[in-house]
Every structure is written in structure tokens, then in C-alpha cells.
């Protein structure tokens, strides 16, 4: 007789990947548990996507009202404590909905930090539990760069940066990636003087150059943010009145004094839970898996940000669902990431779907592109938008393979553009599809039409 396990599946981590896997596997009526050391929902619900969306919504609304010449009332003020309270209420609602879905599916919640004892056993809050199979969905955490002084000078993280209860005069954001740009947007909308530093030559270096240029122009010309590319922070110091940030630009060291420092220096996979005890191979960049998410231990799988590489909520949820479906059906369908969207919640928002132009240049792949600037459509005049564009990319036969949008509410176009790219829609088919003339999505139609002339 084989070994009897406490569960058929234990899933470590309740973020989008772990939750998707758990809810899909629950259809099998097997004994399933999910381990979470914090609130259910992972960083998506509790510290990243939802709290950021709630906070940025408020800050954009405040900035729109206070900066518009139409609204005459100058007595409007922003309450940081009330904003944090709103954010926490929003998170609680989402977390409770996640918890309710897992409970209704009969999934057991194990509260605590998991650590492997052996290949089939973990310890959770002093209890030992066994499973026939494991799914690792432990996500990622803040990566602290090699900056002298982080052990003695206080700083904010992406999690705490949007929970401040009073306004600093000057804030420095270290890191010009998506998270750093969203924090810069949040602060500047509320009247905080912001400096943002990026080691690369432009903001958002993993997007096409037009994206970084558009967001930089919005930051500097509309929000008054000081953008400092090609800068590396080397040390933090504290004096009686302020924090001192020592940074290097080319070969010159300079100092800037600020009230608040936010480290938005990227993330790294969470790997410190006894993977060696289970015989799981991993690197500093993430857990090693095959094309079906199987680790070196054949009964243990991994999905989501703990794999390293490109990450997003949509990608993690897709991986969790695909893995669980394969396990239920004893199939080996491999992931198809064609046309996956990623978004950045600045204003204008950034949406990228499928290939970027940089991706194709690196692959030495031939393509056609068309760009429509936001000023070319009526919506820009109606909604007073100055910076943005749509770029569509097709292969030689005019099938869409990539799209980049910088515009207010760009994320609303994710479904349309993802559908087009995943299902091989041509530029002609998209150009022939009616779009609302006075809305931002009209740029998509115009860009598709322009592709036909290439």
C-alpha cells in the first residue's frame, strides 16, 4: 500500500497563480490546501495591483480637479489618512472575495510560512503536513540593490510608499521601471516634489523608446517631476534635517537632499523555503522548470513570479490555470504567451500587447509598423490629452503581432488587441471594424488603416 498523504495537492502561495491553480483543481473534488503567510490573494490583492489602482485613481482625480481651470474652488485638500483608509477597505473587499471563493471550493487555508522538510512534507506554523503533489506559487519580493546605508537610513518600499499618512516636501524614487513610475505619478499628482532616478538611459527601459519619451514628457512638462536617467544611487546618509542621496552620473558623484526615499529597484523570486530539502533545482533568477512547469522533483510544479523572467498578474493566472488543467486532464499543453498584455498605471497609461519593436529588432525579424499620435484624434481635444500614441506592428502578410498604446485608459484596449494578436487578425480586418470616433480607441483603427499603406 502506498503512503497516505494529508492532501493530494498543497499549493504554496495564494497570489493569482496559486489561486487560479487551486480553484481549477478544486473541480476534481480532491483534498487541496493553500498556504499563505499573509492575507489571501498575495501581492496582487494586498500590496500591488489593487491598492495601487485604488490610490492612483484618487490621486488622478485630485490632480484633474485641482489643475483644471474649469473648477474654481481652491479649498480642496487631499487627506492622506482617508486615502489609506479607502485603499485598505478596497483591499479588504477583494481579499474577502478571494477567501470566499476558496472556501466555497472546499480548499483548506493553511496560515503560516511553509518550509520543505523532505520531498513530500512541509512545515507550516510548527505543523508537519504531507502532500502527493505540490505547486509552488510563492511570487517575488523587493530586490534591494547594493546601496550603502540602507541598513541605517529609513526608506519606503513599493508596499509602504502608497501608505504614507502625511505629505513629504521632496521624494526621491530610485528606479524608473513600472512601479517607480506609478509611485512618481501618485506623489506628483498630490503636489509632492518628485525626483526619479533610473540607471538606464530612459524611463521604462524594457518598453520601446517612444514609451519612455512620452512618459518622461508627461512627468516633466505636466507634473514637474525631475527625471534623472543614467544615474546610479551608491549611498544613503542621514543628517539632522534631511536624507542625503549620493548618486553617480557618468563618473561624477553628486548629492541630493530629500525628505523621503522610495526604493523601487525591481523584484526577485522568493526561494527561501527549503527547496534543497525537496530536491528542487533553482537559480538566483528563479525555480527551474520544464515547458509544463514541472521542477526537478517530478511531483512538484512551479508557476508565477517565482520562475523569474517576465511577470504580470495575467501571466501568472494563466500559468496557474494551464498547469491545473493539464494535471486534471493528464495532458501536456504548453503555454502560449502570444498577445499577452502588460500595463502601467500612469496617466497616460501604458499598454503593451505582443511583440515590441525592440523585441523584433533583437530577433532580426522583418515587420511593418504604423504610429498614430494622440493629437491626431478628436479625443485628445475633448479630454485635453497631450502625450500618447498607438503603435501597431504586423508581419509581412499584415497579421498583427504587436501593439503599444500610451493614452488615458489604454488598459481598456487590452482585450481587443490581445484577441487580434492571438487569433491572427489582419490590419485590414481591424481597420474595417467600427470604432468610436470620439474615443481613444479610434487611434487603433487609424493605425491599422495606416499599416495597409506600408
Predicted regions and their residues:
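Glycine-rich dinucleotide-binding loop and its adjacent helix/turn
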Residues: 49, 138-193, 197, 226-227, ...
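Short hydrophobic core segments
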Residues: 10-12, 114, 129-139, 173-174, ...
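FAD-site-proximal beta/loop scaffold in flavoenzymes
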Residues: 152-167, 255-329
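Short glycine/serine/threonine-rich phosphate/pyrophosphate-binding segments
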Residues: 17-24, 44, 155, 180-183, ...
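A conserved FAD-binding loop/helix module that cradles the flavin
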Residues: 214, 303-359, 437-454
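Flexible, glycine-rich terminal cap/loop adjacent to redox cofactors
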Residues: 10-38, 45, 50-51, 55-61, ...
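Beta1/beta-strand and adjacent pyrophosphate-binding region of the FAD-binding site
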Residues: 3-15, 167-177
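Glycine-rich flavin
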Residues: 2-7, 23-30, 35-167, 200-204, ...
Amino acid at each position: 500500500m502506498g503512503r497516505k498523504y494529508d492532501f493530494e495537492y498543497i499549493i504554496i502561495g495564494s497570489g493569482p497563480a496559486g489561486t487560479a491553480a487551486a480553484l481549477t483543481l478544486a473541480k476534481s473534488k480532491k483534498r487541496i490546501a493553500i498556504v499563505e503567510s499573509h492575507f489571501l490573494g498575495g501581492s496582487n490583492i494586498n500590496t500591488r495591483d489593487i491598492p495601487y489602482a485604488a490610490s492612483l485613481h484618487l490621486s488622478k482625480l485630485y490632480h484633474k480637479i485641482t489643475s483644471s481651470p474649469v473648477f474654481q474652488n481652491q479649498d480642496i485638500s487631499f487627506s492622506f489618512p482617508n486615502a489609506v483608509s479607502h485603499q485598505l477597505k478596497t483591499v479588504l473587499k477583494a481579499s474577502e472575495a478571494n477567501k470566499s471563493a476558496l472556501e466555497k471550493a472546499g480548499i483548506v487555508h493553511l496560515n503560516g510560512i511553509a518550509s520543505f522538510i523532505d520531498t513530500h512534507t512541509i512545515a507550516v506554523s510548527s505543523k508537519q503536513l504531507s502532500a502527493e503533489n505540490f505547486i509552488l506559487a510563492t511570487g517575488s519580493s523587493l530586490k534591494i540593490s547594493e546601496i550603502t546605508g540602507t541598513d541605517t537610513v529609513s526608506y519606503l518600499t513599493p508596499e509602504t510608499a502608497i501608505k504614507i499618512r502625511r505629505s513629504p516636501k521632496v521624494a526621491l524614487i530610485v528606479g524608473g521601471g513600472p512601479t517607480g513610475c506609478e509611485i512618481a505619478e501618485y506623489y506628483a499628482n498630490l503636489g509632492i516634489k518628485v525626483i526619479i532616478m533610473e540607471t538606464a538611459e530612459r524611463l521604462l527601459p524594457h518598453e520601446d523608446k517612444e514609451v519612455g519619451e512620452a512618459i518622461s514628457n508627461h512627468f516633466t512638462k505636466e507634473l514637474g517631476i525631475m527625471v534623472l536617467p543614467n544615474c546610479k544611487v551608491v549611498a544613503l546618509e542621514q543628517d539632522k534635517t534631511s536624507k542625503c542621496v549620493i548618486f553617480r552620473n557618468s563618473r561624477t558623484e553628486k548629492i541630493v537632499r530629500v525628505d523621503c526615499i522610495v526604493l523601487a529597484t525591481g523584484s526577485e523570486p522568493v526561494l527561501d523555503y527549503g527547496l534543497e530539502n525537496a530536491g528542487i533545482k533553482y537559480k538566483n533568477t528563479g525555480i527551474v522548470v520544464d515547458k509544463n512547469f514541472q521542477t526537478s522533483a517530478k511531483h512538484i510544479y512551479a508557476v508565477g513570479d517565482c520562475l523569474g523572467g517576465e511577470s504580470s498578474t495575467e501571466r501568472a493566472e494563466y500559468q496557474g490555470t494551464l498547469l491545473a488543467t493539464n494535471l486534471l486532464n493528464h495532458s501536456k499543453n504548453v503555454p502560449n504567451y502570444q498577445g499577452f498584455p502588460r500595463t502601467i498605471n500612469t496617466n497616460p497609461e501604458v499598454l503593451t500587447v505582443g511583440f515590441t519593436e525592440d523585441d523584433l529588432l533583437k530577433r532580426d525579424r522583418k515587420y511593418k509598423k504604423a504610429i498614430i499620435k494622440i493629437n491626431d484624434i478628436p479625443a485628445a481635444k475633448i479630454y485635453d490629452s497631450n502625450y500618447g500614441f498607438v503603435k501597431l506592428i504586423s508581419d509581412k502578410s499584415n497579421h498583427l503581432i504587436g501593439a503599444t498604446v500610451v493614452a488615458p485608459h489604454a488598459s481598456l484596449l487590452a482585450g481587443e488587441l490581445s484577441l487580434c494578436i492571438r487569433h491572427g487578425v489582419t490590419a485590414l480586418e481591424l481597420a474595417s471594424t467600427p470604432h468610436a470616433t470620439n474615443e481613444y480607441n479610434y487611434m487603433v483603427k487609424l493605425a491599422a488603416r495606416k499599416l495597409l499603406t506600408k
